[in-house]
Every structure is written in C-alpha cells, then in structure tokens.
From Swiss-Prot:
Residues 13-26 have a biased composition (Polar residues). It is found in: Plastid, Chloroplast. Residues 27-55 have a biased composition (Basic residues). It comes from Hordeum vulgare. The gene is rps18. One of its GO terms (molecular function) is structural constituent of ribosome. It comes from the Eukaryota. Keywords: Chloroplast, Plastid, Ribonucleoprotein, Ribosomal protein, RNA-binding, rRNA-binding. Part of the 30S ribosomal subunit. This is Small ribosomal subunit protein bS18c.
Length: 170
C-alpha cells in the first residue's frame, strides 16, 4: 500500500490538444421539408379603400365637460374601455381616462351604471341557469349572501369569546 504523498511534478511538455477529432455524424442536420414558399401572386388590395374613421376628431377637445365625447369611451356597465377597443393613441387614451375620472369625481358621470349592471347580472344568471348543466358554477349573489352569513356568525362567536374572557378576568 502506497501511503506517502509525493509532490505534484509539473511536466515539461506543454499541454497539447488531443489529435482525435470529434466524431460528427455523417448526416447534416435536416431541415423540415416544408419551407416557406414565396407566393407568386402579390397580395391583392381591396378595390375600395377602407379607412376607419378616428373616434376623436381633430376639433374635439378632450375635457371632462365634453360628455358626448366621454360617453363614447365608457362601457354599458360604466367602465372605461381599453385602448384596443377604443383604437386610440396612448396619449389620447390617457387624456380620456383622466377626463372620465375627473367627470366622475365632479359627479358629471356615475362611477357605475347600476341600471345596465342589473341587466348584465340578470343576463349572466340566465346564462348560468341555462339548459346545459354546468359544474361548480356559483351565482355571485348566493355566494355573497353565504359569505355575509358566515362573517356574521364569526363576528358573533368572537363577541361571545370576548365576553367570556372579560367575565373570567373579573
């Protein structure tokens, strides 16, 4: 058994890479046979040019008092529509959003449109209770009622526990 340690001796020959080459496979990497084919016919434009009119005209002022303009950018539930739906530039959307918020604060606009929201809830409930049975679908009003009852129960239980603790301390 060899137990003594010998110091590491540096070899005098410089390190050289092995002469063996990496054995590459003979077949090159195959590209899929479906390549993008260039269409021989150019893209056909429609005969009548269609240009979407901008929602905000050049003379329209984006202001909280301009209710006819602001109402175009609010949904039926009273929510601010997204930029994709509005087709506005970022700057225009920002100005519209600020104008809507300002109009809401100054009570020119309601924060929510409750009449249309009730109709929307009725439609969603009729969709849920349609002919096709759906699993694990809760009607929001029922879960809200259940949660409020549970919260009330927890509140009463906490009151009882506090009263017991107070009476035991005396």
């Amino acid at each position: 058994m060899y137990t003594s340690k010998q110091p590491f001796l540096k070899s005098k020959q410089p390190f050289s890479k092995s002469k063996q080459t990496f054995n590459k496979s003979k077949q090159p990497f195959r590209k899929s046979k479906q390549t993008f084919r260039k269409f021989k016919q150019p893209f056909r434009k429609s005969k009548q040019p269609f240009r979407r009119r901008p929602r905000i005209g050049p003379g329209d002022r984006i202001d909280y008092r301009n209710m006819s303009l602001i109402n175009r950018f609010i949904s039926e539930q009273g929510k601010i529509l997204s930029r994709r739906i509005n087709r506005l530039t970022l700057k225009q959307q920002r100005l519209i959003t600020l104008a809507i918020k300002q109009a809401r604060i100054l009570s020119f606009l309601p924060f929510r449109n409750y009449e249309n929201e009730k109709q929307f809830q009725a439609q969603s409930i009729s969709i849920i209770t349609g002919s096709r049975p759906r699993k694990n679908r809760h009607i929001p009003q029922l879960t809200q009622k259940y949660n409020s009852n549970r919260n009330l129960r927890n509140y009463n239980q906490n009151l009882r526990n506090n009263n017991r603790n107070l009476s035991s301390d005396c």
